[in-house]
């Protein structure tokens, strides 16, 4: 036990959450990749399993390495990452590789590809946490606090927005919550939110009504329309409308709902999913639907609780480090991860339109696994510092009593 505590420092509950998410990922993705293996790897599920296991190990390695450093080290590192992320995002927009008709990845020598937005998300949260800490004395001031904090948020979100609306939305919402927690003037935040909302609405209206090539905006609008249409009673739809539906976005929604409904309370059992053969991307965007089908409501609630525990532990860390870089950083990263998880799960059960967001630490995907692991490692690093301080205080108290 002493060796374990020495090797794995920090919040043991978060460590347990990470390990359980990794094991859940291995089981769910292996089961969900049957059709993918047949079409891409000549039916070799073993290859897919080993490939995904390697990505999980990379993610866990990122957690472990990140947790070793003192969290204050990330103040300068993430500040540097923020300025690196801006040219990376610009390059992604101009020359990024296409994934699902969107330029989201950067390819390095044709061998390795990663999503620059995953890198930028962690960098921006770190930048905000640093600046919030430095500006606490004048945090209510418009010029010295609000403007210097909002401009970086606007820059990163604007660069992600054209090709990845859902990621931009998650990052914007997470940033706004973190700024609220950091005591930025609520009046300024609400005004800024209203301006961004109006600007986004005008942008969508202009593109949809006047642009020849609607690009990703057309995809977003179609997803929302398909989502709304999915709630209509079948009796109100004619045969042509139903046929059209089945060839578009809500085919995914329909198949996901079938997976969820067929899972029941305890599920069909590991490896017994049938909807993995019909769902597009059952190993990434809709992996939660496969979990619900095979492990039922019990399995779904278990995964949900893991993410909620992560958020609660981050809130506890922030409470132990109020108005400090470590507290802001841990909470901001955890909130962003959990919000992404909630959106993925909401899509899988039909509560939200299709977004394309992976389930953190579970869905198959190298860059997402790496950067999520890095973010969780930073959270553990903050908790490690708190634990060390508490042990030091206990030792000092004991010595004083003696």
Residues covered by each model-derived region:
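Hydrophobic alpha-helical segments of polytopic membrane proteins
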Residues: 79-80, 86, 145-159, 165-212, ...
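Membrane-helix boundary/helix-loop-helix interface segments in multi-pass membrane proteins
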Residues: 1-21, 27-30, 35-163, 345-358, ...
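Interfacial segments of multi-pass membrane proteins
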Residues: 132, 174-188, 273-299, 356-373
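Alpha-helical transmembrane segments of multi-pass membrane proteins, especially transporters
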Residues: 144, 148, 192, 328-336
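Hydrophobic alpha-helical transmembrane segments
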Residues: 54-59, 294-311
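Transmembrane alpha-helix boundary/anchor motif
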Residues: 61, 69, 127, 219, ...
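Loop-to-helix entry and N-terminal half of a specific, functionally important transmembrane alpha helix
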Residues: 315-356, 362
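Hydrophobic, glycine- and aromatic-enriched re-entrant/interface helices and adjoining loop segments
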Residues: 99-100, 105, 191-297, 324-325
């Amino acid at each position: 036990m002493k060796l374990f505590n020495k090797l794995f420092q920090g919040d043991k509950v978060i460590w347990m959450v990470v390990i359980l998410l990794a094991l859940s990922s291995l089981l769910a993705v292996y089961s969900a990749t049957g059709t993918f293996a047949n079409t891409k790897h000549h039916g070799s599920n073993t290859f897919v399993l080993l490939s995904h296991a390697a990505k999980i190990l990379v993610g866990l390695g990122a957690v472990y390495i990140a947790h070793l450093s003192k969290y204050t080290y990330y103040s300068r590192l993430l500040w540097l990452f923020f300025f690196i992320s801006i040219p990376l995002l610009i390059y992604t927009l101009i020359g990024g590789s296409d994934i699902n008709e969107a330029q989201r990845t950067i390819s390095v020598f044709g061998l390795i590809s990663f999503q620059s937005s995953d890198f930028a998300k962690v960098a921006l949260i770190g930048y905000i946490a640093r600046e919030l800490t430095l500006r606490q004395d004048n945090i209510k001031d418009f010029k010295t606090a609000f403007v210097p904090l909002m401009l970086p948020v606007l820059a990163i979100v604007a660069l992600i927005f054209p090709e990845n609306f859902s990621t931009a939305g998650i990052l914007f919402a997470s940033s706004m919550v973190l700024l609220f927690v950091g005591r930025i003037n609520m009046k300024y935040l609400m005004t800024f939110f209203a301006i961004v909302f109006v600007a986004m609405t005008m942008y969508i209206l202009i593109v949809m009504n006047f642009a020849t090539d609607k690009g990703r905006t057309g995809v977003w609008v179609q997803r929302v329309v398909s989502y709304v249409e999915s709630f209509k009673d079948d009796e109100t739809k004619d045969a042509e409308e139903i046929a059209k539906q089945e060839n578009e976005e809500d085919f995914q929604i329909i198949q996901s709902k079938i997976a969820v409904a067929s899972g029941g309370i305890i599920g069909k059992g590991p490896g017994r999913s049938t909807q993995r053969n019909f769902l597009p991307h059952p190993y990434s965007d809709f992996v939660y639907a496969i979990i619900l089908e095979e492990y039922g409501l019990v399995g779904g609630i278990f995964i949900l609780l893991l993410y909620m525990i992560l958020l609660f532990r981050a809130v506890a860390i922030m409470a132990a480090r109020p108005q400090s870089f470590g507290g802001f950083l841990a909470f901001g990263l955890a909130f962003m991860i959990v919000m992404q998880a909630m959106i993925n799960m909401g899509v899988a059960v039909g509560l939200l339109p299709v977004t394309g967001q992976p389930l953190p630490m579970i869905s198959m995907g190298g860059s997402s696994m790496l950067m999520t692991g890095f973010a969780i490692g930073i959270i553990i690093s903050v908790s490690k510092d708190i634990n060390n301080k508490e042990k030091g205080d206990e030792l000092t108290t004991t010595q004083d009593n003696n």
